[in-house]
Amino acid sequence: LPICTGLLESGSIHFIFKDFILKNYIEILKNYDYIIYTRFDQFYTGNHIEGRPDKILIPEGEDYFGVCDRHAVIPRKFITEYLRICEYIDSKATSKYPSSYLNCETTYLNQLQENGLSAYIERIERYQFTASLKNDKTNWRISKYRLFGYNDLYIKYPDEFIDSMYNKLKNHSLYKVIMEEFSLFINYLNLITRRKLGKYKRQFFKI
């Protein structure tokens, strides 16, 4: 790389995957109207959203000063440019963007801006969250919240889970959510109750 990108370990892996797909499977991807680019550790709280013409669908949240890089639905006509992130990193175009804080999300957004794709981004309500097994290797967040009702599975980013379940409850009746996703609903109640109790505890004891 011509400059220090600030992208180490898991950040570099994200981009290598995209470059590998671009160089080896792009013609296969062109057989599909939409391509879902996602991580293996996503737990969905409902059916996957359908793609939309002329829109790159990215869930809300987890932007870290850029844009969330964990999931996207891309129309076929955008997929080649979308995957060219390593070409962007190796180009002089990187000098056009601030480098005081670089991570996966900021570099991802810079690349989409450079490739002319940022104008097509549409943020959608989150309907999935990141999960992990207890002993999964991680470079960043260590999972602390157990997902009760699921064998040895943990919630990695609590905000993702809470947002996903909040959206599900907002868009469906309480009866439907309880009947279809009872375990997730109980976990949601448990997590938001813990947060509220923690907030009151800090206020009462001035922690």
Where are these regions (language model features)?
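ER/Golgi luminal nucleotide-sugar-dependent glycosyltransferases, focusing on the catalytic module
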Residues: L1-I207
